[in-house]
């Protein structure tokens, strides 16, 4: 019996020794790095903060109930701002706080071609990653110098319509320039916003977030025709945009298509419009576990615009859409091939269009 107990103790000891000890962040780091971490922490927590404030206000007896009821009625019935360009606050886009946010990774933008400010554009952003932080840095702030690189272009990053049903958080999103990704919203921004008014769509959406893993760029694009149809309807040129480093910000639990986990995630997506990848990044005081993204450079390549082709005699609208879709996919592949050896040296596989 004693030998069995000793054997068990030895086994437990070896198991514990095999578990890597967490890597803690040093206490003495430059103040700027602390502020960068704080900026990202607040950004990641903003939905929770807004919901906490809202429910706290609801808990105050009687005094605020009537204004809160009016506010909720206004959100659900009258306010159509998310589908009409939102309510962006210009100074917020240029706030120095976003420099700290972008400097955390750090995030960069590389321009391939000038964009005519008299035209409208649809930026297709790839990959989705877990939270699409690179898209926010690029299109919702001026921290990476977007406004200087593309003068006269006024982009709105689009997100799920359901996000604009969350009290207070919806107002924060619109203040940052975000709008709904609905068809109506896309058309309103591109046709009523004037010259230079543009939209940025994270094309892969929730499905692609399940493919987000370091060293991999599996894109959901083969059957994504919605943004192509919007381009044909509005005449807006397509601009392929690839971010190297987006998928490196978090690590995700592996789940193949036949696993129970993957099926569960897909059911959530069909029911709610978004999915729940099981991921982890780092914490405030450690490098191995938490909800903060890892510090990894993000290089966003903004490609050359692809104009909507003119309709040839006898050509149908569906043929135009498919032709433009093929051109866009080739442009994305070409963009990846030209920069992969610079910004994706540690990749474990090449770009693949999986859906």
Curated annotation (Swiss-Prot):
Transmembrane spans: 41-61, 62-78
Annotated metabolic or biological route of this protein: Glycerolipid metabolism; triacylglycerol biosynthesis
Membrane topology: Multi-pass membrane protein
Compartment(s) where it occurs, according to its Swiss-Prot or TrEMBL record: Endoplasmic reticulum membrane
Keywords, ordered alphabetically: Acyltransferase, Endoplasmic reticulum, Glycerol metabolism, Glycoprotein, Lipid biosynthesis, Lipid metabolism, Membrane, Transferase, Transmembrane, Transmembrane helix
Enzyme Commission number(s) of this protein: 2.3.1.20
Keyword hit for Endoplasmic reticulum: yes
Activity response to pH changes: Optimum pH is 6.0-8.0.
Pfam families reported for this sequence: DAGAT
Keyword check for RNA-binding: no
Entry GO CC: endoplasmic reticulum membrane
A Gene Ontology molecular function term of the record: diacylglycerol O-acyltransferase activity
Principal location: endoplasmic reticulum
Family membership: Belongs to the diacylglycerol acyltransferase family.
Name the UniProt record assigns to this protein: Diacylglycerol O-acyltransferase 2A
